[in-house]
Amino acid sequence: VALIDNGIYVDGKRTGNPHTLTETYELMRERHGMAWIGLYRPDKEEIQSVADEFALHPLAVEDTLGGHQRAKLERYGDTLFVVLRPARYIDAQEVVEFGEVHLFIGPGFVVTVRHAENPDLAKVRRRLEANPELLALGPEAVLYAVLDEVVDAYGPVIAGLENDIDEIEDQLFGGDPAVSRRIYELLREVISFQRAAGPLREMLDSLQRGADKYGVDLELQRSLRDVLDHVLHITDRAASFRILLENALTVHSTLVTQQQNDEMKRLSEASLEQNEETRKLSETSLAQSEEVKKISSWAAILFAPALIGTIYGMNFTYMPELDWPIGYPLALLGMLLSGVILYRVFKARHWL
């Protein structure tokens, strides 16, 4: 049901509880009171009924039907069209949830249209009904009360964001790999919050500038200034959060780059150490190879005389060379020549 609550107020006191929009219009005209109509996600017919009754501007009606509007204040003749973006901090999920409420403020009527559960306008209505003197000031009192409720609800959001940012600062230097994503998420929430709360400064300034022209009560003007002071404090805090998070992103990027550089340096040092080990192994292998060459060369040189000596040391009956007068000198000469030849060959090949 789109019609959540509506009533007719005379001198700040509720005088009736009509159940339909038609009954509301009739009772308003009958008692010459202020109508406060509360709608929740109304359909086109319900919005059009209100628009026809109070001569609402088609552009404002179109914005209300479409929803998803930025915070703004527009004046169409004697009617104010106000869009507010309330917010609340969901502690369990550590996120900021945004709502949307539209207000039509005109002579003798207030129409509130909520597109989300937030804010709790029933609480605002109860507080005003408990203070007939304030409610008797007319539709502007309702606007003030809704603004005050929305801005007051920004306080816990600021506190929640501040707590999250404190946690980020701890994670930033703790080496948490997920910190960059969390910083980005928080920065996105802070920017969304700035878009919701930022326009309120100009909106409240505009209301104050037109207060005298439209006969707004002086006490109500002072209350609006108090809301403005609260808004200025909140928007300044949000701006400081944004700067902190942007700096945190820069610091994190620097830390990541430094870690990458340190890792590359470590890998380079490890590679150099490995290359040095490889070089040493190569030198050792080369040295061993040279030693093997020398040993093999000398073994070959010694092998040739040993081979000749072994051949002529065999105990065969028939070995003609043994009867030669020059056999012994020839064997010695063969041993010597084979050793010299092999030595010169190995020397030429740098094996010795």
Regions found by a protein language model. Name each.
Residues 1-240, 269-290, 321, 351-352:
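Peripheral, non-transmembrane regulatory/ligand-interaction domains of membrane transport proteins
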Residues 232-352:
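Hydrophobic alpha-helical transmembrane segments and their immediately adjacent juxtamembrane loops
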